[in-house]
Amino acid sequence: MSALRAEQQPSRSGERQPLVAQGRWGPRRWRRTAAAAVLLVEMLERAAFFGVTSNLVLYLNSLNFNWDGEHASRATLLFLGASYLLAPVGGWLADVYLGRFLAISLSLLLYLAATGLLLTTITDDGRRSFCGEMPELPLKPACPSANCQGSWSSPYCATTLYLVLLLLALAASSVRSNLTSFGADQVMDLGRDATRRFFNWFYWSINLGAILSLLVVAFIEQNISFLQGYSIIVGLVGLAFFIFLIATPVFITKPPTGSQVSSMLNLAFQNCCPGWQWWRRPSSRNSEGAHLLPDQRSNQPGPSPQEDMANFQVLLKVLPVMVTLVPYWMVYFQMQSTYVLQGLHLHIPNIFRTNPNISLPLRSDSSNYRIPEAWLLLANVAVILILVPVKDHLIDPLLLRCKLLPSALQKMALGMFFGFTSIIVAGVLEKERLQYIAANQTVPQLIGKDLYYAAPLSIWWQIPQYLLIGISEIFASIPGLEFAYSEAPRSMQGAIMGIFFCLSGVGSLLGSGLVALLSLPGGWMYCPKDFGNINNCRMDLYFFLLAGIQAVTAVLFLWIAGRYERTRQDPDSQNSTSRVRG
């Protein structure tokens, strides 16, 4: 009864407790119900997101737009990067103006509008309305010169598609940054172990949504039509929005509490440029509290200047750890861009047998469904769906009893190693594929309505690199998320979570920029004689370059992580950190 009475008491901070918590089930049962609703919304939203990203290269490379492989791969990396890079924007709006509940609701509405616009571009009338008529690709005789251009420099409908993808990235990033913390708020009162388990199952729900998307949506997009596939995506977002609104009575919602961005910038300038008097002027909070008694000052909203300084010091310690994860994210996002491009140029088996006497143009009907290339992502997702529960219920408790449980930083280092091995395996496979291409051993295959000249290597050879990147995700991404949330002071958890997602987006954008740089004349990814394929590119060298970058930064990460662990073991540092975290 005491817990129930505590739930009924109004919060001084304006926090709204769930109305239904006064029922006979008690607050603990409703906290789990609220968390389950958040997990379901996340699963549906991720299913929609992966429905867009898994075949975005194929969609842009199709006859609807005729983008070449380099442009399509770069657009996918830019979209993935923006969907993470913009995470602090949604978090800042929630902290300062909207609150997390309203920010998530508006983000889902924007999500619904953006996916609707993307659906419109699939139809001929909608595409002509937004993009105009597609320019004709001039027919030219074969040219042996390396300067022959097979496509126009500006992709068709680029402005419209990039704008739609930007809106979609803004919505997805806002949902990601706010729904994670919003879900943790629902179980915070149940203890630290409940929060840790929530993050594990939150990540599990993400990958369950990916399974749903890859098995159903990706198959429909590749073998039936993008119109039906993207219609399902719009329906998934609409259902997520409906469930989130229906579950409103069981949610704990908190009002906006303000942002510490200005305080952090103030302290940064004080440390870098102490001579700048403007940054050293007293804040309004100091001047307002100067004449107050100590008890009255403690009730002022927002952290004190001492807490600001302590938070800034924590940020200086945590940020280098997260920055050295950026090359890992460069490797990780290849899974949804260049790995897909590589798979389109490997032999993809048919699900059903076809009559060999049927001509090639007639083999694209319903009797010749091909296994979607995006299904290779299932190897990554299946590893996570299987290993996360096993790790949570069996491996971690066993290691804990034996006192061998690695720290979050040690797990992240192990994740970097598996990411390194994944990109090495991809490079070796690409090198082998190019040997078949050099020997003029190619297999023409139709994927949807598009013709690709693939090497006679089975696409199943990509499974090891997807499995390895999936294992790396368990050891790098999940512990990284837990590290960002647990190491941050309570007043900065949202900001540091946003920085974590933002830096992962930086990794995707750096990967896109590296592809663009290597696509310049003379670069490894420069292959103007290839329209829509990569057979004259040297993507194997690109993979090996990423592996080298990952190896160097992994060594740097080990050094930074070692210093961080030694700092945490310092008694004075532990005392100051505990005071900040309350």
From Swiss-Prot:
GO terms for biological process: dipeptide import across plasma membrane; innate immune response; peptidoglycan transport; positive regulation of nucleotide-binding oligomerization domain containing 2 signaling pathway; protein catabolic process; protein transport. It catalyses: N-acetyl-D-muramoyl-L-alanyl-D-isoglutamine(out) + n H(+)(out) = N-acetyl-D-muramoyl-L-alanyl-D-isoglutamine(in) + n H(+)(in); glycylglycylglycine(out) + n H(+)(out) = glycylglycylglycine(in) + n H(+)(in); carnosine(out) + n H(+)(out) = carnosine(in) + n H(+)(in); L-histidine(out) + n H(+)(out) = L-histidine(in) + n H(+)(in). The chain crosses the membrane at residues 33-53, 77-97, 102-122, 155-175, 201-221, 232-252, 312-332, 371-391, 409-429, 466-485, 498-518, 541-561. It is a multi-pass membrane protein. GO terms for cellular component: endosome membrane; lysosomal membrane. Belongs to the major facilitator superfamily. Proton-dependent oligopeptide transporter (POT/PTR) (TC 2.A.17) family. This is Solute carrier family 15 member 3. The lineage of its organism: Eukaryota, Metazoa, Chordata, Craniata, Vertebrata.
